[in-house]
Amino acid sequence: MERDILHCDMNNFFASVECRLNPELKKYPVAVCGSVEERHGIVLAKNELAKAHGVKTAETVASAKSKCRGLVIVPPHFEEYLKYSRLARKIYERYTDLIEPFGMDECWLDISGTRRLFGAPEKVADEIRCTVKEELGLTISVGVSFNKVFAKLGSDMKKPDAVTVIPRETFREKIWNLPLSDMIGAGRATTAKLNDYGIYTLGELAQCDAQWITKVLGKNGYMLRCYANGTDNSQVMPADFSMPAKSVGHGVTTTADITRCEDAKPLLLELAQDIGKRLTLQNKYATKVCVNARSSILRNREWQTELPTATRSPMIIADTAYRLFCDNYDWVNPVRSLTVTAFSLVDGGAVIQNSFFNDTIRLEKMEKADGCIRDIRKRFGEGMIKNAVLLTGLAVPKSKAVVSLPGNMLNK
């Protein structure tokens, strides 16, 4: 049976929600931007009026203002974005339960086998587009095709407030003249490498030799060639599906540069506490840790090591990360941001080989203490109990948000 796949993309999502909350903003070019004071001062989203002035996502606020003097800057309100994301998903659920989120503003829908019930897929796509506009006051672009890659490509081809169909019979005429960068999976480095070999369009990618591109780009190159030829068989996964975690990480850009090892200690503990909490929720233990340091000149350095024992203890993770960082960072430049990642995870029920503690009693005590701390925070709030080292003027942004969304591209 031919598959009917939709890709729904909410147009200029953050900026559109802000204009929905404050209709006066619709008259002006608007950009949703991170905090300059907390050094997150980049454009997260912009409306069509700002886009017409050349404002681009991910550029600095200063750059955006230089292009558009009347640009209205608004801070992000992630709770509202999540609210509207969920409301849109409720609309999609009227047609199928196979809905795979791809970020807050995008979803794939598999409506295969529903033609007798709802009509042709392009009709369903247009109904969804109109319903979102009427009920939520937001516009979406919908791509319709026989696989996920082409459905997403379709939603990108015509914006805002549009439906684009890429049928199996004519997909070559529709998409083979498009640049490589238009297709999911073809990032800057991949595109640049293929450009060096004279491959610029999806058609040229589709027609290149399979063995050659595998040699040049590995499995990813072969996969991209398959995508360009319309042979993407990845399934639309339900919203509650999630791949087993291979790692758990957290990073932050500080409000002021770190200039000494000692100043990194409370920050690493703060990151480790988040990691420990998430490992506990997933019933996982980590056996290795990785630290990534980004300098003030935006140069990244990364190191990894084994943990002294399989653990989810924030103190053990933080202590190992601290020693790893201090032993390796050269301090030619101050540090702008740090990321800690715990990986090589094992299940909580697995037998843990204790190589650091001479007895398990101390480990059990630490984990019980960690559990008590988590319980207190869950019951009374995150700020009710802290490690003393976190009271030393930690230069961490006041606002932190972690958004976890399911969704995977799986070939079966």
Protein language model features and the residues they cover:
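A generic structural signal for short beta-strands and their flanking turns/coil linkers
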Residues: 26-28, 69, 138, 285-287, ...
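Short, hydrophobic beta-strand segments
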Residues: 108-113, 302-306, 352-358
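Short, well-ordered strand-loop elements centered on a beta-strand within folded domains, enriched
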Residues: 43-44, 163-164, 300-304, 351-353
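Short, charged/polar surface micro-motifs in flexible loops or helix N-caps
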Residues: 13, 36-39, 296-300, 345-349
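A glycine-rich phosphate-binding loop feature that marks nucleotide/adenosyl-phosphate handling sites
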Residues: 146-149, 227-230, 285-296, 335-346, ...
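C-terminal hydrophobic structural anchor segments
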Residues: 316, 322-379
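DNA-contacting surface of Y-family translesion DNA polymerases
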Residues: 7, 182, 190-335
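Gly/Gly-Pro- and Ser/Thr-rich, intrinsically disordered tail segments characteristic of DNA damage-repair
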Residues: 1-226, 236-239, 277, 360-412
